[in-house]
Amino acid sequence: MPVLPMKDTVYLSEDGVSVSELLNRSRLFAGQAPELFDLEKYYTANMALLPDRILSINGSTEPAVMAGMDIAMVAGDEGNYKITTAADLERFKEKLIQ
């Protein structure tokens, strides 16, 4: 899967109010789409989460992680960003008119 190294300082909070731990960013990466999986293994991993657990996953790679699949990391690209927020959409619109 494509990944980017973390540039920001990353904190863990157990309660959402105070910092519990400073995480070592040299071991943290931001995953990007699209990922590539062995279809049969990935399908089986997703089917194992049906019907109720599939809605609680944190991304399309999580079923593969939960199933113990080997997931190789490759260098991602800053220009490959997901449109999730209004700010992301504005960034995309700006790219279109350039």
Kindly label every feature range from the protein language model.
Residues 1-30, 36:
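Anionic-ligand binding region
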